[in-house]
Amino acid sequence: MNINLPRSKRIMCYGIETSKDWLVNYVKTHRDAYDIPICRDSVFNIQYAIDILQIQTGIQQLTTRLGYAIGDIPANEVPILAICTNLKSSFRNRPSQAQVDHLKQILGAGEPKSWLLDPDDFN
């Protein structure tokens, strides 16, 4: 039996909480190894950090998002490293557990968790 239920308008993300400062500092400590130019703009440094983490972990769809913890009232936006979402193309290309474990090791983080994302970010 094929049941097609309407997709929820909520976009969920599997990811790890981070901070802008952590990402900027990560670039500073890995700049030479990846031949990254010195840059004072935090937006560029955050993207450089994502690029380095993608290379190190093999998680090509790794990105930053603002997420909401499920059950967090009032809902506060938290910066996260998004590993994959519940969107079909993202979920289909989700990373292996070994890749996620490597990312956790780099971040010194616990298990990734589910976050709610703002659907307007995907329009």
Name each model feature, range by range.
Residues 113-120:
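Intrinsically disordered, low-complexity basic segments at termini and long loops, enriched
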